[in-house]
């Protein structure tokens, strides 16, 4: 296993429940059983807080850790664009990730393609929460 993935997954500062959330969703990976609950607080079309709880593998934990820390103070439209890029990443022959989101290059690469569903679970949960 990649030590970089473990290091990213160990950042759990947003592993919390937001009591006064404005958006919330739970999503489960039917293939492996990973489960992700996302709670978001959105004000003036901007994500101002992001909390998650998960019972999942380290790849899913690394993905949600990066997504949560990168999403705070970003406009919902920007997150929507990121979701589109990431969801098409593996299908589009590993398309380049926009500069604004280059931090995701740490986990989205061809060596992790076998863990695609684990990496995408947090993105699907956010999409569900925001009804995108």
Features from the language model and the residues they span:
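Domain-level signature for proteins that mediate thiol-based redox and metal-cofactor handling
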Residues: 1-132
């Amino acid at each position: 296993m990649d030590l970089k993935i473990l290091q990213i997954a160990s950042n759990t500062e947003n592993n919390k429940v937001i009591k006064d959330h404005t958006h919330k969703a739970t999503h489960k990976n039917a293939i492996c059983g990973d489960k992700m609950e996302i709670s978001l607080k959105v004000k003036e079309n901007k994500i101002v807080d992001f909390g998650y709880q998960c019972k999942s593998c380290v790849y899913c934990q690394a993905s949600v850790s990066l997504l949560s820390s990168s999403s705070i103070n970003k406009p919902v439209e920007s997150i929507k664009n990121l979701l589109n890029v990431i969801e098409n990443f593996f299908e589009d022959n590993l398309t380049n990730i926009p500069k604004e989101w280059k931090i995701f290059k740490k986990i989205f690469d061809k060596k992790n393609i076998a863990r695609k569903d684990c990496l995408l679970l947090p993105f699907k949960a956010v999409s569900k929460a925001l009804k995108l």
